[in-house]
């Protein structure tokens, strides 16, 4: 059985250190289809990746990477909810075996945990990283090396966790990693609070989108995040664009993901996440064939004890009801 994300973080390699791992630890290649080519290689050959990287870097002068649209000049040292200026931090990186089965395969998902967050859920299970910003500053070159080392370790993909606020840095690092031989699919593993414009800039770069869709009710989103009242509307728009770009999840050898959308939803106490509405939205606005992970591992972490309605785990009946709703909505691919 795969480890939880918190267990993985305890055993993963600290930021920067993975770039120094000896190539001697290399496993068999993690690519699930020898004919597969990640989308970003075509964009790179066409010379468009460089232009996209430049456009994204310009956004940092008046930041609109997420729906908060703070318009802070991060290149001049200004910051907002995410707490970042022109640099970025990585907490840890390594093969992760606790993600969805199509990502894990035999050799794990090559997971890179970025520090800080633009959403700041009060129940965050990784609050030390997201809220407190634990991690180490790294360069674009080091991030590129980390991607390449994960590939050499046999990982099936490069899994970018909480990437929204560091998209320009990721694309810059990608430009460095490609000449080094990077050829794994990129996984954009996001909390779902992404601006539509940012996701559009990633068209042709990301192979696998894996967003959360946390809340259907603006009031719930506002209460249990850092006042992201527009979360339901923003997440819906971003996820529809992700689906337009990559479509349904496509699998290669061994059932390993190559391209497509994996959609996550965390069941919360008293149906505060609006699970019944979520599954109907997926079936209607995306497709009944969307790969959906209805997650039952909610536990009251960080500041959740201050909010009585979410200060407990969900019950078995609550989770079973969520699955019933998903099946009743016609969803066919439940993780």
Please place each PLM-identified region on the residue numbering.
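Short, structured loop/turn "capping" segments at alpha-beta junctions
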Residues: 184, 217-220, 231, 246-254, ...
């Amino acid at each position: 059985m795969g480890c939880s994300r918190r267990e993985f973080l305890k055993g993963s390699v600290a930021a920067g250190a993975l770039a120094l791992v000896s190539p001697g630890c290399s496993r068999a290649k993690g690519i699930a289809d020898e004919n597969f080519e990640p989308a970003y290689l075509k964009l790179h050959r066409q010379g468009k990746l460089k232009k996209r990287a430049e456009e994204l870097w310009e956004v940092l002068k008046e930041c609109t990477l997420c729906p908060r649209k703070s318009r802070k000049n991060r290149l001049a040292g200004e910051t907002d909810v995410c707490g970042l200026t022109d640099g970025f931090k990585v907490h840890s990186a390594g093969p992760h075996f606790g993600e969805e089965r199509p990502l894990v395969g035999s050799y794990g998902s090559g997971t890179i945990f970025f520090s800080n967050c633009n959403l700041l859920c009060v129940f965050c299970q990784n609050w030390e990283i997201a809220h407190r910003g634990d991690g180490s500053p790294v360069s674009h070159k080091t991030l590129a090396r980390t991607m390449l080392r994960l590939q050499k370790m046999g990982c099936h993909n490069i899994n970018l966790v909480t990437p929204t606020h560091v998209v320009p840095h990721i694309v810059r690092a990608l430009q460095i990693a490609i000449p080094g031989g990077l050829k794994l699919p990129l996984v954009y593993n996001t909390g779902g609070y992404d601006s539509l414009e940012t996701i559009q800039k990633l068209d042709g770069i990301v192979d696998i989108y894996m967003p959360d869709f946390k809340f259907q009710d603006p009031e719930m989103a506002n209460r249990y995040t850092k006042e992201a009242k527009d979360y339901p509307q923003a997440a819906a728009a971003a996820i529809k664009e992700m689906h337009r770009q990559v479509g349904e999840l496509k699998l290669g050898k061994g059932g390993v993901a190559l391209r497509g959308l994996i959609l996550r939803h965390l069941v919360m106490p008293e149906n505060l996440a609006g699970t019944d509405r979520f599954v109907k939205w997926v079936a209607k606005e995306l497709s009944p064939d969307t790969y959906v992970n209805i997650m039952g591992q909610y536990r009251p972490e960080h500041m959740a004890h201050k909010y009585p309605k979410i200060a407990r785990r969900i019950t078995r009946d609550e989770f079973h009801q969520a699955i019933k709703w998903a099946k009743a909505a016609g969803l066919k691919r439940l993780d």
